[in-house]
Regions:
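Basic, amphipathic juxtamembrane/active-site segments
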Residues: 94
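Short, flexible coil/linker elements and helix-boundary hinge sites characteristic
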Residues: 16-17, 49
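Exported/periplasmic ABC-transporter solute-binding proteins
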Residues: 23-55, 60-68, 75-80, 84-90, ...
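Sec/Tat signal peptide C-region and signal peptidase I cleavage site
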Residues: 18-22
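N-terminal secretory signal peptides that target proteins for export/translocation
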Residues: 1-3
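Bacterial N-terminal signal peptides
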Residues: 5-16
Length: 246
């Protein structure tokens, strides 16, 4: 059976009117994907009757929870490495991994008059700049790679404040705890104010985000992952500021 036919079959089972009893699945979701995941969960629930309960956090922290037995039915990471490790360690359903979104990094300031870009970082007209923890958050790692590419990582190190995930990092900027910081471009659309610079992908490694199924018995989780790959799901992901794989 081809991947496309398998996807159609899973969606047909999950979305069929009156199909089985309504199921609920707890899903681990990288913080940067919060808004998109909420929209996708609502759409999927309306179509299928199945409920998706997302739990948000840094990819590394969620991976650790899953490795220690946390009862998630699926994992939407902000990288490819952690889902691959779960597959390698037989903690995920074989063959279930796929790239659901490709993210973009942005430098963001709540000050709409700020002119952001490499010169802003070099001139450093700020006391604090926020990034997510590079050890656990892929967008934080991409931020550090950007500073390294610009030769500014050592110079700016004393001014860096680290959020435990990209959601907290955004809050640092929005609250004024940091004048600027690196976030997911998708978060900026929800802000409705401020200035931003979309970081060229040449300055950091690609932010390909993979999903993996953890509980093969979860009808809701299997259907939800299939929905992410459907035309409707991909359109929602695109509307929230992500590219989707061909």
């Amino acid at each position: 059976m081809t991947a496309l036919r398998a996807l159609i079959c899973v969606l047909a089972l999950a979305l069929a009117p009156g199909a089985a009893n309504a199921d609920t699945a707890r899903i681990a979701v990288a913080s940067n994907f919060t808004s998109a995941a909420k929209a996708l969960a609502d759409e999927y629930a309306a179509l299928s009757g199945h409920a998706i309960t997302p739990s948000y956090g840094a990819t590394g922290a969620l991976y650790l929870q899953i490795s220690q037995g946390a009862p998630y039915a699926a994992f939407l990471a902000a990288d490819q490495a952690r889902p691959a490790l779960l597959l390698q360690d037989d903690r995920a359903v074989p063959g279930s991994g796929f790239t659901y979104a490709i993210g973009e990094l942005a430098l963001f300031s709540r000050d709409a008059a700020a002119v952001l870009g490499p010169d802003y970082l070099k001139q450093a007209p700020f006391e604090r700049i926020a990034i997510a923890d590079p050890a656990t958050a892929p967008y934080g790692l991409a931020a550090m790679q950007t500073l390294q590419s610009l030769g500014l990582d050592a110079v700016l190190a004393p001014r860096i404040v680290r959020g435990k995930n990209i959601g907290q990092t955004f809050q640092f900027i929005w609250s004024g705890a940091a004048e600027a910081g690196f976030v997911a471009r998708s978060q900026i659309a929800d802000a409705g104010a401020g200035a931003h610079w979309t970081v060229p992908s040449s300055l950091h490694e690609p932010i390909a985000q993979d999903a993996v199924l953890l509980d093969a018995s979860s009808v809701a989780a299997r259907g939800f992952l299939a929905y992410l790959r459907s035309p409707a799901g991909r359109a929602t992901i695109s509307r929230h500021g992500y590219a989707t794989p061909e």
